[in-house]
Amino acid sequence: MPAACESLLDDIEDIVSATDPKPHDRQNARQNIVPRARKRNKNKIQEEEPPADSTIPGTQKIWIRTWGCSHNNSDGEYMAGQLAAYGYSITEQPEQADLWLLNSCTVKSPAEDHFRNSIKKAQEANKKVVLSGCVPQAQPRQEYMKGLSIIGVQQIDRVVEVVEETIKGHSVRLLGQKKDNGKRLGGARLDLPKIRKNPLIEIISINTGCLNACTYCKTKHARGELASYPVEELVDRAAQSFQEGVCEIWLTSEDTGAYGRDIGTDLPTLLWKLVEVIPEGAMLRLGMTNPPYILEHLEEMAKILNHPRVYAFLHIPVQSASDSVLMDMKREYCIADFKRVVDFLKERVPGITIATDIICGFPGETDEDFKETLKLVEEYKFPSLFINQFYPRPGTPAAKMEQVPAHVKKQRTKELSQLFHSYSPYDHKIGEEQHVLVTEESFDSQYYVSHNRFYEQVLVPKDPAFVGKMVEVKIFEAGKHFMKGQPVQDSYIYTPSITKPLAKGEVSGLTEESKPPNNPESLLQTSREGLQTFFFVTALLAAVIAFVGIKLL
């Protein structure tokens, strides 16, 4: 042990010599130090300005562009509502906006092309850009999205965070899924603020994702597996919308027929609960449903579609009348299943409108396959038919299949379109008196648009007294996609809304206390004053710390 101590002492003596000052010598020496006064500019501290307005989140103008389905439009409404509630100004003029929020659709190639072109335009105009929707969710590593912020389809409740960081110059990407105890949720909360594109219509997404794995579909890559919202949350959302003057509800999802299979319930159960809260005269429209899942509930669905507050309308995509093509598509039904659904509903729900979709030129489709599809349309004469020329979507199995030549796809699309336009679905209704619900203005601004019991479009005179009302009209003209009606003299105009609708652009779900200031300058002034106080306190604190440090020397 003594040897070890001697060794340690030798090491210390190598470092500290006998001539070095001792600790008490260092303390005495400090007394002879004269502190040098630091130059301060008190005026500079007090007059220091906060950053420019463009860097203060919550004061900018935002333009939102949405492509695609009702589900995507609902997401866009929710994002607009949250941004407006935070203080951002939502503008319909893209050139005036500081930031573009582009909400994309991946169903068809042309929609993605428009999305990509809009990104380019935004960058050329030196706009901040945030991307959302199915395209960036499904393929976020595309070169044209490099360096841009992305909001995932299940992360729309965090749009304010993403926009805020983007305005500050950062790139943010939130693409994760929402889960509860490991179980995937339907998405963002349904009670979030929103700005309805049409204050009279509430779009409710009842579930996200689906149970199928169609070989041509890119949406599955973005929306994923089925995840349904609880019945009570959907009913609460519907009830709230009626309290805000809504008179029509659209239920939407990638497949409404599959609703509830992941949470132990089903679509009829939800619909019966919803009709309990629908005011008299208000209407509910059911969204797209695939044949396999509605087959199990035909009896109940027929009863619901006969309900006076539910449109006798159903969108059932068939895609092809060839079983071999349906098998290649992995549609999980045969043409006999589709016909069974349609025939049953036509019998049990007199006058029901059946809308459907058809893809022309799917890989492997022969002339005989296509003739089967033509025969189906000829037999049922669908009043609403969405005809789509096949586009291979990158990353889908169908893109790797042997393709039908482009000129053949175009010819088949043209032939089917000609067949569709060869019959008039509404001529027999001329002279009928119908009750219609008026909800919007026509594209040419010449008429108001309404829908009858079967969700058939009826154009009525542009009388402001009709908006949001149930009106009785007499049909005097019929076109391919619409009818025209004249109000019946002395008929009663019914108001289904239980309260005055929100103004266009007004945020849903906000109390008076939580609404943003009407004057953007007041918000800006508050931000400036807060920042000025912050900077002054920070500078004062730094000065105190410096003074204390000097005293301790």
Curated annotation (Swiss-Prot):
GO terms for cellular component: endoplasmic reticulum membrane. It is found in: Endoplasmic reticulum membrane. It is an enzyme of class 2 (transferase). Residues 17-57 are annotated as: Disordered. Residues 196-427 form the Radical SAM core domain. This is Threonylcarbamoyladenosine tRNA methylthiotransferase. Residues 60-168 form the MTTase N-terminal domain. Keywords: 4Fe-4S, Endoplasmic reticulum, Iron, Iron-sulfur, Membrane, Metal-binding, S-adenosyl-L-methionine, Transferase, Transmembrane, Transmembrane helix, tRNA processing. PROSITE patterns: MTTASE_N, MTTASE_RADICAL, RADICAL_SAM, TRAM. [4Fe-4S] cluster 1 binds at residues 69, 105, 134. It comes from the Eukaryota. It comes from Xenopus tropicalis. Its main location: endoplasmic reticulum. It catalyses: N(6)-L-threonylcarbamoyladenosine(37) in tRNA + (sulfur carrier)-SH + AH2 + 2 S-adenosyl-L-methionine = 2-methylsulfanyl-N(6)-L-threonylcarbamoyladenosine(37) in tRNA + (sulfur carrier)-H + 5'-deoxyadenosine + L-methionine + A + S-adenosyl-L-homocysteine + 2 H(+). Its cofactor is [4Fe-4S] cluster. Belongs to the methylthiotransferase family. CDKAL1 subfamily. It is a single-pass membrane protein. The lineage of its organism: Eukaryota, Metazoa, Chordata, Craniata, Vertebrata. Binds 2 [4Fe-4S] clusters. One cluster is coordinated with 3 cysteines and an exchangeable S-adenosyl-L-methionine. Its EC number is 2.8.4.5.
